C-alpha cells in the first residue's frame, strides 16, 4: 500500500476517478437492478439462484453505515470495492512490469 501512496500520479488518478464516480452516483437515480439489490440486502441468505451474497453486502453497506437510503448509499460499497480493485490492479502491474505500465493500467481502468 505504501507503493501507491508514494506515487503521486497514482493517488491523483485514484482520487480523481473516485470523485468522478461519486458525482455520477449522486446524480443518477437507482435503476431497477439496484432497487432489487437494496431489497435483496434486507433478506440475506448464503446464496440465491441469481446472485451471491457479496452483492447484497456491498449494496447494504452504505445504508448500514449511514442509516440513510438514497442513490449514493446504495452505491457506496461498490465505489469502495472498485477503488480497492484499482489499487490491486496497479500493484499487480507494478510487480509484473514497471511503473509507467502500472500508471497507464490505472489510467485506462479508471
Q: What are the roles of these predicted feature ranges?
A:
Residues 5-31:
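Transmembrane signal-anchor helices characteristic of membrane glycosylation enzymes that use polyprenol
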Amino acid at each position: 500500500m505504501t507503493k501507491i501512496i508514494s506515487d503521486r500520479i497514482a493517488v491523483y488518478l485514484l482520487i480523481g476517478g473516485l470523485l468522478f464516480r461519486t458525482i455520477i452516483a449522486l446524480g443518477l437515480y437507482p435503476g431497477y437492478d439496484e432497487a432489487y439489490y437494496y431489497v435483496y440486502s434486507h433478506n440475506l441468505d448464503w446464496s440465491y439462484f441469481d446472485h451471491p451474497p457479496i452483492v447484497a453486502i456491498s449494496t447494504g453497506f452504505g445504508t448500514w453505515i449511514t442509516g440513510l437510503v438514497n442513490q449514493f448509499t446504495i452505491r457506496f460499497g461498490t465505489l469502495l470495492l472498485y477503488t480497492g480493485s484499482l489499487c490491486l490492479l496497479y500493484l499487480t502491474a507494478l510487480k509484473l512490469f514497471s511503473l509507467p505500465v502500472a500508471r497507464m493500467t490505472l489510467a485506462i481502468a479508471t
